[in-house]
Amino acid sequence: MHRIATKPGDLDSEKKLESVRQTPADILFISTADTELSVLAQVWGKRFQKNARLTLSLMQAYPLQHPAGAEHYADNVLCKAKLAIFRLHGGYSYFPHMLDEILHIKSHGAKTRILVLPGTDEWDPELMNFNDYAEPLVRQMFSYFHEGGIDNMELAAEAVELLLELSLIHI
């Protein structure tokens, strides 16, 4: 059953629905920053290609602002991942549908572990409502991306591997 609003005026007519075609993967990284996605493709792509047990998929976040795009992504890609990391510029006010979809799939038994980070320099406490991890860990991951650089992306990749190992123990 679809969860998108059907009342006139409920959809933002300014936002065009972009079809989201992404193959499910073990690790999803969704960001509003193209440069960040480019660096991760280099650093994480090499690292996770070596580990044949894990697949990685990177995606630009903006198509997930549309309610139908967010719902489709949650139902067809997100719920099949082991870990999904979102780095969202604008937080809940820019991505309410996607963040609500996270709560929806989790309430229906999705085992995907979720890490939602601010996409700006400012800490956003509201995003903690969507995280499966404690605030100190979320802040540490936020610092890796806030500071940027190859070394921090390597540290973030190590943390991702550890989070996945811990997830397997607790599932």
Positions of PLM-derived features:
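Structural motif
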Residues: F29-T35, A61-L64, R87-G90, P118-G119
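Conserved small/polar residues in nucleotide/adenosyl-binding loops
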Residues: I169-I171
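Flexible, charged surface loops at secondary-structure boundaries
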Residues: V20-P24, N51-A52, N76-K80, S107-G109
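Short alpha-helical segments and helix-capping/turn motifs at coil-helix boundaries
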Residues: L11-K16, A41-Q42, A68-E71, P96-H104
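N-terminal basic/disordered segments at the start of proteins
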Residues: H2-R47
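Cofactor-cradling patches in redox/metallo enzymes
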Residues: H72, L83-I102, I114
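A short, well-structured beta->alpha microelement
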Residues: K7-K15, F48, A52-N76
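Hydrophobic or amphipathic alpha-helical targeting/insertion segments
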Residues: L99-N152, A156
